[in-house]
């Protein structure tokens, strides 16, 4: 429906998302449905906020006349994306009227079902002819996903709608993704830019896919990643696609759901890496279905490029904790996904926790209140989620000019754990124990 185009749609379940936006198993054309399926059948998580850019006013084409058989007053048009608005239904030469002669609905496959009303003109018809308009997913392009701001209407589209999430829904986005589109450099880079600045104060991470038409083997990954421009500390880059049986998904859709599930198990604190956590997928492949079989050694090579993948070790699992900033950066707070997310989470949490203090009198009581409250709050997360954290108010950070301007600055120190990416075990031959055992007695 037009009412759910370019607006943030909050869904507390996959069923709720499907009810608002519709659903199709054609994940290549209806890309949001990937997340609907995964969050219902692979990693059950909620809430999810969807932004649909498929606009029936703009992305449509003619529906050529379809003749369908009537069975027990019902006729099903076996095509997805048919628009109810402007639909013409005829029985022979007689044009029928909706809600007088028939009703319309969609079945679970997304096909249009025409149900004849027994008192209507077409009640005795054995077949119907249907024509009108239908959605044209091929008309959607990367610039629809990126979106824009219309200076005349004041309307936002695409990624620009991310701005509306907090003021409308009161939620701060944590992971941004565009499955089926983020492999496009323009889309991926724009998504990272949005993650860096949400409502002027918040930050998030972006999960991006590499183009499997360009990166067909694991040794192609480095060049494709760099040419795509996916080098931000705010992005988590994945290659190739993930499979569940015969279904093919963008890796970003699966990994984002798996990480959200991990967060939920971890008190909603993003202190853990998704790497090496078993995930119910059955394989990896290119977008065209070509199977990719990586062992640990090859997966680690992919990781060395700052790209995550999946390997099979008694079950498939994501493999890789680096953000896109690796290997160009060696800064621990930027190259480890869980460390970067902890910095983002702490920054966002501080803003939300102390927002009510804004415009209070800037006095010592306010300073002490924030310092004491924050130190107590942060201490509760040690040692499980980080090694520790502290906050201070320094005179050097708060000169008279800042105080007179109504500005105050705190300096916080946090110590999230880095992942144990490599665990080495050095074996030594204990000759003393050997000789002792042989000479005893």
Question: Would you name each region that the model predicts?
Answer:
Residues 1, 9-12, 22, 31-59, ...:
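A glycine- and small-residue-enriched flexible loop/hinge signal that marks low-structured segments
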Residues 1-9, 15, 439-441:
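N-terminal alpha-helical "arm" segments
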Residues 6, 84-88, 125-127:
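Exposed beta-strand and adjacent loop surfaces of beta-rich binding modules
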Residues 43-107, 134-137:
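Extended beta-strand solenoid/passenger and fiber regions
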Residues 48, 58-63, 131-139, 143-151, ...:
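Compositionally biased, low-complexity/repeat regions
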Residues 103-125:
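A surface-exposed beta-strand-loop module
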Residues 120-136:
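Small/polar beta-strand repeat architecture
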Residues 336-396:
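Acidic, low-complexity glycine/serine/threonine-rich segments
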């Amino acid at each position: 429906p037009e009412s759910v185009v370019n607006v943030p749609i909050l869904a507390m379940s996959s069923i709720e998302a499907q009810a608002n936006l519709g659903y199709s198993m054609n994940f290549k054309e209806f890309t949001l449905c990937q997340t609907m399926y995964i969050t219902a059948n692979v990693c059950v998580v909620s809430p999810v906020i969807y932004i649909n850019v498929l606009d029936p006013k703009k992305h449509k084409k003619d529906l050529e006349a379809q003749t369908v058989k009537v069975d027990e007053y019902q006729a099903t048009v076996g095509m997805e994306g048919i628009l109810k608005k402007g639909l013409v239904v005829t029985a022979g030469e007689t044009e029928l009227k909706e809600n007088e002669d028939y009703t319309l609905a969609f079945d679970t496959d997304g096909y249009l079902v025409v149900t004849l009303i027994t008192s209507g003109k077409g009640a005795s018809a054995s077949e119907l002819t249907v024509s009108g308009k239908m959605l044209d997913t091929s008309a959607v392009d990367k610039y629809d996903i990126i979106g824009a701001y219309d200076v005349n209407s004041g309307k936002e589209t695409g990624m620009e709608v991310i701005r509306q999430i907090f003021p409308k829904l009161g939620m701060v986005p944590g992971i941004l993704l565009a499955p089926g589109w983020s492999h496009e450099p323009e889309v991926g880079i724009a998504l990272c830019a949005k993650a860096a600045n949400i409502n002027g104060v918040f930050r998030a991470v972006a999960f991006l896919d590499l183009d499997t038409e360009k990166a067909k083997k694991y040794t192609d990954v480095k060049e494709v990643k760099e040419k795509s421009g996916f080098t931000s500390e705010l992005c988590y880059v994945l290659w190739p696609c993930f499979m569940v049986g015969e279904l093919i998904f963008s890796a970003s859709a699966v990994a984002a759901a798996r990480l959200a599930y991990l967060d939920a198990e971890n008190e909603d604190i993003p202190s853990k890496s998704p790497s090496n956590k078993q995930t119910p997928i059955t394989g990896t492949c290119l977008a065209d279905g070509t199977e990719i079989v990586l062992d640990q050694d090859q997966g680690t090579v992919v990781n060395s490029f700052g790209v995550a993948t999946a390997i099979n070790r008694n079950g498939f699992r994501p493999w890789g904790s680096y953000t896109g900033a690796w290997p160009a950066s060696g800064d621990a707070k930027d190259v480890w996904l869980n460390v970067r997310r902890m910095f983002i989470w702490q920054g966002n949490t501080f803003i939300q926790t102390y927002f009510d203090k804004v415009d209070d009198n800037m006095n010592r009581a306010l300073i002490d209140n924030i310092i004491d409250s924050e130190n107590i709050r942060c201490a509760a997360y040690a040692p499980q989620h980080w090694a520790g954290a502290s906050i201070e108010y320094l005179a050097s950070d708060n000169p008279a000019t800042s105080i007179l301007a109504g500005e105050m600055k705190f300096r916080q120190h946090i110590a999230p754990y880095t992942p144990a990416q490599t665990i080495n075990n050095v074996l030594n031959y204990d000759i003393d124990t050997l000789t002792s055992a042989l000479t005893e007695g």
